[in-house]
C-alpha cells in the first residue's frame, strides 16, 4: 500500500476529528455540519477499502499534524495574495469589436465568441487574469487578436454565473482554438497563458490540434441566433 495514501487517510481522520469537536461545541453552521456528515461516510468507506482502523489512523494523523505545526512559522500560515497578470492594455480590454459571422457558445460560466469570417490569419491569444498558488484563479478576459490588432474572438465570464476553474478556462480555450483553426488560422498564445492556462503548447506558443479534434471543437461552437 502506498505510504502517501495511508498518511493522507490518517491526516484526514484527525482533521475530521477536530471539525467534529468544533461541531460538538455548537459552532458549526449548516453547510459545515453537512460536509462533516458526508466526510464521515467517506472516511468509513476509505477505512474499509484500506483495511485501516479509523481511531488508530486518527492518532497517527494527530502526530503528523503536530510535527508539521512545530516546524511551521507564523509567516508560512499567511494566505498568499493573488497576483494579477495582464497581457492586454486597458484599451485592448475595453475596445468594442464586431463580427461578420458571429458564433457564440456558453460553456459553464464562460461565454466563448468568435468571428468565423476570419480565415488564413495568424492569431494571438491574450488574457488578463489572477493567479494564486501558481495556478489561474479567475479569468477577467481573454481575447484573440490578428497581427493587425483586430479582435476576432473572446472568452469572458458570465456575470450571472460566477465561478470557474482553471480547467474550465483551458477547455474554453480549446474550443476557441478549434473554431479558429478550422478556418486555417494559425493560433498562438501569450507566455502567461502558456504558463498558467494552457500547458499543452510547444515552445513558440503554437497550439496544434489534429484535424478530427478541430472538427469536433468547431462543431461545438453554436450560432448565437
From Swiss-Prot:
Keywords: Eukaryotic host gene expression shutoff by virus, Host cytoplasm, Host gene expression shutoff by virus, Host mRNA suppression by virus, Host nucleus, Host-virus interaction, Inhibition of host innate immune response by virus, Inhibition of host interferon signaling pathway by virus, Inhibition of host PKR by virus, Inhibition of host pre-mRNA processing by virus, Inhibition of host RIG-I by virus, Inhibition of host RLR pathway by virus, Interferon antiviral system evasion, RNA-binding, Ubl conjugation, Viral immunoevasion
Residue ranges of the region described as CPSF4-binding: 175-210
UniProt-annotated stretches for the region RNA-binding and homodimerization: 1-73
Region (Disordered): 204-225
Localization annotation: Host nucleus; Host cytoplasm
Annotated region described as PABPN1-binding, given as residue ranges: 218-225
Molecular function (Gene Ontology), one example: protein serine/threonine kinase inhibitor activity
One cellular component term from this protein's GO annotations in UniProt: host cell cytoplasm
Entry annotated with the keyword Ubl conjugation: yes
UniProt motif (Nuclear export signal) ranges: 132-141
Similarity annotation: Belongs to the influenza A viruses NS1 family.
Biological role: Inhibits post-transcriptional processing of cellular pre-mRNA, by binding and inhibiting two cellular proteins that are required for the 3'-end processing of cellular pre-mRNAs: the 30 kDa cleavage and polyadenylation specificity factor/CPSF4 and the poly(A)-binding protein 2/PABPN1. In turn, unprocessed 3' end pre-mRNAs accumulate in the host nucleus and are no longer exported to the cytoplasm. Cellular protein synthesis is thereby shut off very early after virus infection.
Domain remark in the UniProt entry: The dsRNA-binding region is required for suppression of RNA silencing.
Protein name, as recorded: Non-structural protein 1
Name of the gene this protein is made from: NS
